[in-house]
Structure formats: structure tokens, C-alpha cells
Amino acid sequence: MLGGHLLHGGDYNPEQWLDCPEILEEDIRLMKEAGVNCVTLGVFSWAVLEPEEGAYDFDWLEEIIDNLGKADIQVILATPSGAMPHWLTQKYPEVMQVRADGQRNLPGKRHNFCYTSPLMRAKIKTLDEALSERFGRKENVILWHLSNELAGNFSDGACHCELCQSAFREWLKEKYGTLEELNQAWWGRFWSHVYTDWEQIHSPAPHGETTVTGLELDWRRFVTEQLSDFCGMERRAVAKYSDLPATTNFMDTFKNIDYNRLQKELDIISWDNYPFWHKEKDEVPVAVQAAFNHSMMRSMRKQPFLLMESAPSVINWRENNPVKRPGMHMLSSMQAVAHGSDSVQYFQWRKGRGSYEKFHGAVLDHKNGSNTRTFRDVAEVGKRLPKLDRLLDGTVNHPKAAILFDWANWWAVEDITGPRLDLDYPACVLSHYRAFWEKGIEADIVDMDADLSSYQLVSAPLNYMYKAGWAEKVKMFVENGGIFVTTYFSGMADETDLCFTGHHPLEDVLGVIQEEIDAPSEEFENQFAYAGQEYRAQRMCEIDHAKEGTEVLSVYERDFYAGCPVVTRNRFGKGEAYYLAAESDLAFLRAFYGDVFERAGLKNALDTELPCGVTVTERICADQAPADGDAETEKHKGVVFVMNFKNAPVCVDGIGRWTDAESGTVYERKLELGAFQCAVLERQAD
């Protein structure tokens, strides 16, 4: 926990108000009133920090940092590569990105630069080093914020210029060595797409190649690598005169960049959380999505993360942008902390008067100062967080289950032309995660490079691609006593999207032989029974055969494949593996995972059934985490968050004895929660 306390604050843009000293003075006074203890500076300040090439003006920034320090407000200092000044693009137009259609962008928007460009890298490296030298040892500067929402330029973040084409070819040479290996990996003899010269290779383009999924996958990997390398360059630049940790702000399940690769350049994970609260009357789907994203960020490094941005109330970039209803700001903020965040930060502190984000929510609106509902909501969070500092310092969530979410698998599933063109990998994974969330079973969100040894249960929905070593890792996990769940259309292809021949890589573990995949329309949906209830088999129905010894729990009831298995369980070593051959609905996933949790010995922190809309998480001291398989440490002392996402009161029964960590109230057997309320509990000693 940075500074030993939870951070509360957000993006502060004083450069927009340098001609209004009374505003800057008022800002600090109101920050103290709102309980703000940390702000992020300099995110989009390049044009003010370097108004002319090589002419730096840091004095205004130093004055702001010093004034914040006098008020005991800490600073996260950004490098300003998120948006370029016009003098740069005018003098060096070659730094601007080239689109997939070959057209070079005009100046504008954000991140409109080539990550490969040596000139761009040199310019920002020099500026970053100067910032590091001037501010890297300031007492109240605690963290580097590298750029901003990398690749977030209203496109896919890729540049297709000749520099990038050349770098891509060199990357491919390093990966494959020879064109023969590349042609084999991309199945180049199909349609005579055999490359005989490295110069023939070009990035995917709407007026060029769009049908070779191996090329598409490698291009996406290359873009991630170039962007990660750029981020690493900035990390090294600020480290020249400073030993502060560094982060950059991620954007949930952002398809274009593999965050599991990018995170390797960072010391701390942070991200920007903008759930679509009040999209519908039922807030649970949005709560599940936000919880999934928080869990994914925490899981990347198995440590607390930072909520770098969130909206104090409204945003400005969806078709309709509802304000947060009373109670939702506190609940949404506490949800982040409950899942492992050591901060609640906002975009932004004060609304700007003009341009694109002038109507994006902020702590301070254009008028009325602190006399607004939003300010009061923020101030309430500012009062609550310090009460949790002592309890949460050094704590981390410690799930015993994991769900696979892998970027390369995502790219492959949605790029291929297969049984369906409308496969939605994140939606599929999220439907499985919801079954965990509703039971209060925490899960890490991991990729195929993760270590599985600390988990009792691993679920891998729609695991189409098997990276090298993944099958062996899963096999060892199950052999050693783990429970593995996977689904239809899994284990189909390798990392370059070449289909496996012969057998499924985990056929012996799963106990199932794949044969066909039916993608029925609604009129031809199938059905099956599980635990005495009927469920739909829809959209993807795999026609499989159970191997000898495999337990068939459900079969199709219709069509020519009636009697073929839908749900199977196979004992392998000390563990077991489940295969779900068809897509079904949430009702089935609830029933299925309820049984799996029981077999895995997984319970929520309250060890009770949760009402609809309620979930729980737990943070415990990292050095007190229960040892794997150690029953004596199962009732460790932790901090439990009980969250109600229903806009109505609920009662949680059968909870045992707990103490409210903030009020000291003792709860025995039941806990009553108001609408959109979060309770923070400590276990009562027996």
C-alpha cells in the first residue's frame, strides 16, 4: 500500500487553469474537504511542459507539486506521451500513425503516433528523463504514470507505416527463423499464399490480406510487443534519476493489447473503471463485469492494484450517460477495494470548460463548487477509506479458483471463420464468472502462462487455442488433484491457428472424443437434463463420444445426436475434469458450478447462501494466507466485504459471528444491508 494508506483523488489538470490562480488555490482547499490525498498530474501536459522543441517549462508544475505537498497531498506524476503537441507533428509528420488502409493520420486525438518511430521515442525519452531529474526525488511524488491508456486512440492502436512493416518482418524472422517455418505456421499453400521473400509480408489490411489468421495473430502479437517495448522505454527513462515504481492505466478487456504482456514492464497494475451503471434496472450484470475486470487486474501480479480512474458520477462517451443513483458511487468504489484495489481515483478533479471531455463527470462541476451531490458522495468516500487503512494494509485477495481469459485465444476465436461468426469470447467467459460471483466464490482471472498449482478449481470456457505447454500444465494440475472445467470448441488449434490432428490434446484427461460441431439456429435448439432439470442446448452443440470410464451426467434429447454426452466428468489421477459440450444458459451454469464448488470444497467467506444481487470478497494479510490444503488455517482472520447491488434492502442469513470493521457492531447469524450498500466485516474470535 503506497504510503501506508488507501489513495483517494484522481486526474488533476491545473495546466488548464494556470491563468486562474484563484481556481488553483480553491482546488487544494476543496481537495482537503473531499478527503483527497493523492492526485495524478501531467497526463496531457506535453504542450505546456515543452511549448517549443527543446524548451522545457517545468516551473509551473513544480509550484503545483510543492503546493500540494504543503497540503499533504501526494502526486502520481505522468509522462505526457498520451497526446502530442502540434509543433511536433508539424515539424515531424512522420511520427503520426498510418492506418491499415495506408493513409497517414492527420494531427489530432490521442496516441496518434507510431510506437516504432525512433524520432518519437527520442523526443519522449529526453522529456521523460528531464522530468525524472527534476521531480523523481520529490518527497510527495510517489509513482510514475507512464503515458495514458496506451493504444487508446479511437482505433486499434496499430501503426502500419514502413517503419512498422520493417520491424514486423524482423520480429517474424526472430520468431520463425526461415520463411519455410513461417509458411508452414500460416498454412501458406492454401490459396497459394506462400511467401518467398520477407519483403512480401505486409500487415493485415482491408485492401490486402485479411484471410490468414496466422498472420492476423502474429500482427496482433507484434503490435502488443511494440507498444510494450515503447512503455518499457519510458519506464527506463524515468528510472534514470528516480527509483519510484511505475504503472500505466489499462482499460478493462481491451482487445487490441495483451495486457498480460504489457504488465511485465510495470511495477504496479492500474486501470480505468467505467461501468455502465443504471443501464437497466438490474445492476447485477454490470456489477459482474466490473468485478471480473477488477479480478483480472489483481490477478496479473497477484497483488493489490490501483483504480486509477473512475467517474464520480457521469461520463460523456456512451449514447446515453445516466448519473449514478444515490449510494452507487460508494458501492462502486468499495467494490474496487473489495477486489484488491488500494485506491479510488477519479477522472477528473475539475471539469474543463471546453473540448471533448467538458461534460465528462468530475468531482467539481462547472458551477456550485462543493455544494453538489457528487462532491458530497466523493467526500463520503474520502471519509470512509482512512478507516480501512489499518485493516487493509498488506492484504490481498487469495482465491482458490481461477478462470482462463487469454488474449491470443480471444483474437483467434473471433478472427476465424468457423461454426459461428458471432462467437463472443468475453461474454462466454463472463457468463461462467457470474456463476462464481453469485455464490461469492472469488476467482483469479489468468492466461495460459499462469501457474495453476495454488488453485483447487480452474475453468477454461471456449478454450479454442492451446498454447505450447498448456495441455501438459492442465494434465499435471488434474493429476495432482485439481478440478478442471472446459467447454465446447476447446483444444482445436495451436498458437498459429493450425488445427490439431488426431486427438484432442487433453483427450485422456477429459475422457471425451470430439467428432462434430453443430451451430443450430433457434428453431433447431436442443435440450438436456441435468440434476433433474431441463436446460437449453443452443448456438454451439458439440457432438462427442465418452471414452470408457467417463461419467456421463447429461445427454442431448433431440435430433440425430440424441444420446450423445453434453456434460461429462472424468477421473484422472487425483483430480477430475468436466467437459460441457454445449452452450447453455445461466440457469444451467448456476446449477452446474454449484455442484462443482461442493466437490472442490469451495465456500464463500461467509459460508452461507447469498441473496440475489449480493456477493462477498475477502482480503487477508499476504503472509497469513491459508496454506494450500491446510485445514487449520481455513478460518484465518480476514476482512470481508459484503456488497448488495440491488436497489432494495436484503438480509443475509446464516453468517455466524462477525464484527462491523467500521462501527464495531457485532452481527450474529444475519446481516441486513440497505440498497446499494457495502458492509466491511471482521471475523469474531471463537
Predicted regions and their residues:
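Conserved, mostly hydrophobic/aromatic
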Residues: 10, 31, 39, 68, ...
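Polysaccharide-binding and catalytic clefts of secreted carbohydrate-active enzymes
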Residues: 101-268, 272-279, 283-292
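Aromatic-lined substrate-binding rim segments of carbohydrate-active enzymes
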Residues: 25-33, 40-103, 233-241, 464
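Boundary/entry segment of secreted carbohydrate-active catalytic domains
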Residues: 1-20
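Short, well-ordered coil/turn segments that N-cap beta-strands
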Residues: 4-8, 35-37, 69-75, 137-142, ...
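Carbohydrate-binding surfaces of carbohydrate-active enzymes
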Residues: 195-202, 240, 263-267, 274-686
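Aromatic- and glycine-enriched glycan-recognition loops and surfaces
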Residues: 15-32, 52-67, 122, 126, ...
